[in-house]
UniProtKB/Swiss-Prot annotation:
Probable toxin that belongs to the MSDIN-like toxin family responsible for a large number of food poisoning cases and deaths. This is MSDIN-like toxin proprotein 7. Expressed in basidiocarps. Keywords: Toxin. There is a cross-link at A11-P17 (Cyclopeptide (Ala-Pro)). Belongs to the MSDIN fungal toxin family. The keyword ATP-binding does not apply. It comes from the Eukaryota. Residues 1-10, 18-34 form a propeptide. Processed by the macrocyclase-peptidase enzyme POPB to yield a toxic cyclic heptapeptide. POPB first removes 10 residues from the N-terminus. Conformational trapping of the remaining peptide forces the enzyme to release this intermediate rather than proceed to macrocyclization. The enzyme rebinds the remaining peptide in a different conformation and catalyzes macrocyclization of the N-terminal 7 residues. One of its GO terms (molecular function) is toxin activity.
């Protein structure tokens, strides 16, 4: 799952402005806070 999340990371940053400093935790958990 980490690979998929890493690939969608830029998409999350664009679609989910709510994630900023939590990006690292997002990749670690593999879950979207949005």
């Amino acid at each position: 799952m980490s690979d998929i999340n890493a690939t969608r990371l830029p998409a999350w940053l664009t679609d989910c402005p709510c994630v900023g400093d939590d990006v690292n935790r997002l990749l670690t958990r593999g879950e979207s806070l949005c």
